[in-house]
Amino acid sequence: MFALFIWSFMAIILGIDPGSRVTGYGIIRQTGRTLEYLGSGAIRTQVEDLPTRLKRIYAGVTEIITQFRPDMFAIEEVFLAKNPNSALKLGQARGTAIVAAVNQNLPVFEYAARLVKQTVTGSGSADKVQVQDMVTRILRLSDKPQADAADALAIAITHAHTIQHSLQVATSAKSTENHEKTTALLRTRYSRGRFRLKI
């Protein structure tokens, strides 16, 4: 029964690569072990004042959620930047995107950039071109997505792989005394908002 559940599991995942001027987004559908590309692009905020940029990011993310109705929201974690001002603006853009997701009752998951690269390319130090190439292969795309969109899709793919791993752990734990704890953890992690995980 657990193996059947893994194969029938389905969710739409929205990945976000935050930026104060360009915020990439990517949407995939996970059905069991299969990933399907639904859409991607970038929210561009070519204005000077930060408050207006944040407003546009919020509106853009909200519009994407309304259009694609994802079950989960995955976003890149803040990383240390050499320029403190740039890091601050990135953090504000990231926070704005998260608020947009939370206001739509989406569960939010965060991933370090190095983990995303490692998951998609096999190397935590991969460059943007390598990420683009692997995202194109994994999702069987005819054309490479733009860099920011590819990064967002990579984040969504990383979350899909995390779900798959969690379900495999639950499967192996079924016949053990840890099964109840494992399934409770999965419900806690994946059963917020509109999405429901049935085990």
Curated annotation (Swiss-Prot):
One of its GO terms (molecular function) is magnesium ion binding. One of its GO terms (biological process) is DNA repair. InterPro entries: RNaseH-like_sf (IPR012337), RNaseH_sf (IPR036397), X-over_junc_endoDNase_Mg_BS (IPR020563), X-over_junc_endoDNase_RuvC (IPR002176). Binds 2 Mg(2+) ion per subunit. Mg(2+) 1 binds at residues 17, 148. It is found in: Cytoplasm. Its cofactor is Mg(2+). Pfam families: RuvC. It is an enzyme of class 3 (hydrolase). The keyword Oxidoreductase does not apply. The keyword Cytoplasm applies. The active site is at residues 17, 76, 148. Keywords: Cytoplasm, DNA damage, DNA recombination, DNA repair, DNA-binding, Endonuclease, Hydrolase, Magnesium, Metal-binding, Nuclease. It catalyses: Endonucleolytic cleavage at a junction such as a reciprocal single-stranded crossover between two homologous DNA duplexes (Holliday junction). It comes from the Bacteria. Its EC number is 3.1.21.10. Mg(2+) 2 binds at residue 76. GO terms for cellular component: cytoplasm; Holliday junction resolvase complex. The RuvA-RuvB-RuvC complex processes Holliday junction (HJ) DNA during genetic recombination and DNA repair. Endonuclease that resolves HJ intermediates. Cleaves cruciform DNA by making single-stranded nicks across the HJ at symmetrical positions within the homologous arms, yielding a 5'-phosphate and a 3'-hydroxyl group; requires a central core of homology in the junction. The consensus cleavage sequence is 5'-(A/T)TT(C/G)-3'. Cleavage occurs on the 3'-side of the TT dinucleotide at the point of strand exchange. Belongs to the RuvC family. Homodimer which binds Holliday junction (HJ) DNA. The HJ becomes 2-fold symmetrical on binding to RuvC with unstacked arms; it has a different conformation from HJ DNA in complex with RuvA. In the full resolvosome a probable DNA-RuvA(4)-RuvB(12)-RuvC(2) complex forms which resolves the HJ. This is Crossover junction endodeoxyribonuclease RuvC. The lineage of its organism: Bacteria, Pseudomonadati, Pseudomonadota, Gammaproteobacteria, Pasteurellales. The gene is ruvC.
